Structure formats: structure tokens, C-alpha cells
Amino acid sequence: MEISKYKAVLALVMLQFTSAGVALFTKAAFMEGLNPTVFVVYRQAIATLFICPISFISAWRKENKPSLGVRGFWWVALTAVIGVTVNQNAYFKGIDLSSSSMACAMTNLIPAVTFIISIIVGFESIKRRSMKSVAKVIGTGVCVGGAMAMTFLRGPKLLNALLNQDNTAWLLGCFFLLISTFAWSLWLILQVPIASHCPDHLYTSACTCFIATIASFLVALALGNTHLPPWKLDSFLKLSCCIYSGFQLAISFFLQAWIVSQKGPVFSALFNPLSAVIVTFFGALYLKEQTYLGSLLGALAIILGLYIVLWGKSEDYQEESTDLKLENEHNTSSQSDIVSIMIGDKAFRSSELLEPLLM
């Protein structure tokens, strides 16, 4: 078989390895003294410097220049504050206080939390007689139960049992990771109004990164990082961690956008547990992170719940894709397919995703 058929799979596997690398890299840098809040500023700034020139060149080559408008700008600003600034600060503070394996396991809660928020805001409805709708509810419950087990039912130590860890710091770290999960889910929800104001995904992402950099810098100052010492990258590990994480953030955007355009959002989410497995193994091996029976069982429950939710979501995506195909058959003026990105039962479309994002 041609290897081109497996490009999306290879890209997703690579993305999971790079994401796992960020979790492990940052935990090691935090153990050496890197401030998580300062790290977020550096990461966002590097990602912005990478994305903005590409966005400018892409917009310059188009006949219809992208524009957000006043309302679109406020939606992007809200996304930058909640979905990026709050999300990343909470996520990396959670890694600092708990472990990188816990952080990666918690990210598997995102589809379930997004499902809950989608119901609240009206993007999703529960069909009692639909098996897949019931599956989404059951999967969400399993995910929540797994998260509670990871947080409170730690159980006996399986790896690195001789090391001690502060229980209060662990619980606080889990709390920050849950905040990050909700902020991440809100970021997904907010893509709907943003796309309705400006369908240029690259342009809106560049704007989001730029605003998030400013917001993250203000948060860092507000938390007391007003002197030079916290901002010094006085070791190779700290410097390389910031550079690697910044480029990974920028590159992951291109990979995710391309994968969604090829295979859809459900396919992309199926690979999320891979990073948790990678981080758990290497975290215990190199960072001496403690592994608990309760945490391991909770992580397995979250992964099980994730796949149950995704099985239920697959019907929504398939139905929407079928409707779009029928619509495109009757639309003779359109020469390209339209990709639907599902958020709940509703979708927003972006033909921009069909542009060659990976060269």
C-alpha cells in the first residue's frame, strides 16, 4: 500500500509524541526552577513569532483579505483569554504541582466536558431513544468518574514507591488541570462564533496567539513576576524547553488543521490517549514520577469513557458529512468540498482547511 494513505495516522502519532515531549520537557524544567507562568509567556511569544508571518503572507496572497470586525475581535479576545491564557497557565501549573502523566490523562476529559458545555449552551441535545446519544451520556459519566478516581483514590504506589509527594500539592495540581480542561473545552465551543465572523482559520489563530501573548504577560506581572530573576533562562534546559514548546504549539496547529480536513475531528481525538501512555512510561523512568493504582485505573476509565463518547459523536459527524455531500452535489457553483467541524450537534464550515497547510 502507498504510504500516502497513512499520512494522517503518521502525523497524529508524531503530534502525540511531540505533545508528550512538551509535558515531560516542561516538568523537568519546572523541577529545575522555571516559573510556569513565565514559561507560558515565552511559549506564546515564540508561537506568535512563528504563526504571524505565515498568516500575513497567506492573507496577502488572497484576493479577499480576512477581517474580523468588531464582534469577531471580541470573540477572538475572549478565546485568547479563556482558551489560551487561562488554559495554559492552569495546565502547566497543574503539571508543576502534580505530574506530567496526570496532565496528559486529564486531557482525555475534553470531549466529555465539551459535550456537557454543548448541552448547556444549546449546541447539543440528548435523544433518549438514540443509542449513540445515550452512549455519550454514559461515556461522559465514566470520564468524570475516572477523573475523580485519579484525583482522590490514589491507592498504593506501583512505581517509585520510595519517593514522597505532598498530597495537598497533588490535589491542587489536579484542580488546576480540571480548570484547564474546562477552559480547553470552552475554546472549542468558541470556535463556532469566531468562524462565523471570519472563516480564515490561520488568520484567527494568529490573532488569538498575539492577544494571548499580551494577556499572558499581564497575568505574569500580576502574579508578582515583576523582577528580572524569574524571567532569566539561565540553563540550557529552560531555554530549549521554551523554544521547543513554542514551535510545537505553532506546528501542532498546522497538523491538527490538516488532519481535521482529511479525516475529521473524531479521528483526531482517537489518538489522544497515546500521549498519556508515552508520558506515564517516560515520566516514571526519567523524572521518577510516582504511579498509583488508583490513578492508573482512573486513567483507564477516562480513556474508556473517551472512546464511548467518540463512538456516540461519530454518528453526528457522519450525518453532517452526508448532508454536506448532498448539498454540494446540488451546488454547481462550488468547485471545492467543504469541511465540517463538529461542535456538538451543530457545525461550522471552513473551506480554508483544504489549502496545503503541510508543505
Curated annotation (Swiss-Prot):
It is a multi-pass membrane protein. InterPro entries: EamA_dom, WAT1-related. It is found in: Membrane. SUPFAM superfamilies: Multidrug resistance efflux transporter EmrE (SSF103481). GO terms for molecular function: transmembrane transporter activity. Residues 18-131, 199-310 form the EamA domain. Pfam families: EamA. Keywords: Membrane, Repeat, Transmembrane, Transmembrane helix. Belongs to the drug/metabolite transporter (DMT) superfamily. Plant drug/metabolite exporter (P-DME) (TC 2.A.7.4) family. This is WAT1-related protein At4g28040. It comes from Arabidopsis thaliana.
